[in-house]
Design a protein with these regions (language model features):
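His/Asp/Glu-rich metal-coordinating catalytic cores
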Residues: 2-75, 80-239
């Protein structure tokens, strides 16, 4: 990246997509708040036919591992591979804390259990718990998605408030976890958001995203009709 030293500028706020914008997967972002940096997510992308023999790719972590950029922390929004799957490839080089909620940690910790003391790099926090640094603070804001306990991130900075949505959809009856809580977003409205960094996957589709729980009655009817073995396939991120 050219002018990487701009990220150490103590006068301005910067947002950099290392991966995840203009593509599906590879979510990896960097915020710089007057010279204090924080990384959001560290995902993988699934390779397509243009890369024969390659299964996955990861955004280049050079910017925050091998340059003059020294992040204060990494924050994980949820446990899907396109947001956390890259960590295992450079986990040993991370020398800053990784913040996430309990479910996300419980789901991904198996990736690192062969590394002695891996848990010391993680800091488990609650939703709405404020974590403060010199030039910014943040809170995890619960939302709904196709995995339990996903979150967005609300940043409070010296120059304004930023909301990073993470992956989300409005699900009033999720298979697991709490339903989408409109009150949480009313609170964000009251705080005033100066900048929104938002997930836009399928935003151009003019339809309502239905809840996965709507499949339950159909599955029940089908299973009652069958007497033999039943094999059900599902998307790889389903739990």
């Amino acid at each position: 990246m050219k002018n990487i030293e701009l990220l150490n500028n103590k006068k301005n706020t910067y947002f950099l997509s290392i991966g995840g914008i203009g593509e599906i997967g590879g979510n990896n972002y960097l915020y710089s708040f007057k010279g204090e940096q924080v990384i959001v997510d560290g995902g993988i992308s699934f390779a397509d036919d243009s890369l024969p023999g390659v299964d996955i790719t990861i955004p280049d972590p050079y910017i925050f591992l091998n340059s003059n950029i020294k992040p204060k922390a990494m924050i994980l929004t949820h446990a899907h591979e396109d947001h956390v799957g890259g960590l295992e490839y450079y986990f040993d080089k991370i020398d800053f804390p990784i913040y996430c909620n309990q479910f996300t940690f419980s789901y991904i910790k198996h990736k690192f259990n062969k590394i002695a003391g891996y848990e010391k790099k993680f800091i488990i926090i609650d939703n709405f718990q404020e974590i403060e640094f010199e030039n910014f603070s943040f809170q995890l804001i619960p939302t709904t998605h196709s995995i339990p306990d996903p979150t967005g991130i609300f940043f409070t900075t010296l120059e304004g408030n930023i909301y990073h949505t993470g992956d989300w959809k409005i699900d009033k009856n999720p298979v697991t976890g709490s339903p989408f809580d409109y009150q949480n977003y009313q609170l964000l409205k009251d705080e005033k958001i100066d900048l929104l960094i938002g997930d836009s996957t399928n935003a151009g589709v003019n339809e309502i995203s239905r809840s996965e729980s709507e499949l339950d009655p159909s599955f029940g009817k089908l299973f009652k009709k069958l007497n033999g073995r039943i094999v059900v396939t599902c998307f790889s991120s389903n739990i």
